[in-house]
Amino acid sequence: MDIDIIEEDENPMLHRTDVRFEVVHDEATPSRLSVRDSLAATLNKDAEEVVIHKLDTKFGMRKTVGYAKVYDNPEYARDVEQDHMLERNKIVADGEEEAEEA
């Protein structure tokens, strides 16, 4: 799976960078989590700082175009993002981490 960054837009007000990217894959469309991990590695960021919003694969193509928000800190992601987006990206809130450990 190869990831190419198409566009990066700084959003200093929300402490994030909006990223449009393209993924070329050999098999079926990769999962949201595997794309998130690969994009985080490409950008030298922690996976919890990356929130994948959209993945779009055209029928029959082995190319996926996506949109992600890359935060400066995981705390900013938890403060700004909606709960369902955090769930989809497996980003756990602070209160939930403590409940899981118990």
Curated annotation (Swiss-Prot):
GO biological process: translation
GO cellular component, one term: ribonucleoprotein complex
Alphabetically ordered keywords of this record: Ribonucleoprotein, Ribosomal protein
UniProt record similarity statement: Belongs to the eukaryotic ribosomal protein eS24 family.
Domain of life: Archaea
Molecular functions (GO terms): structural constituent of ribosome
Protein name: Small ribosomal subunit protein eS24
Coiled-coil spans in chain: none
Keyword Ribonucleoprotein: yes
HAMAP family linked: Ribosomal_eS24
InterPro entries: Nucleotide-bd_a/b_plait_sf, Ribosomal_eS24, Ribosomal_eS24_CS, Ribosomal_uL23/eL15/eS24_sf
Keyword check for tRNA-binding: no
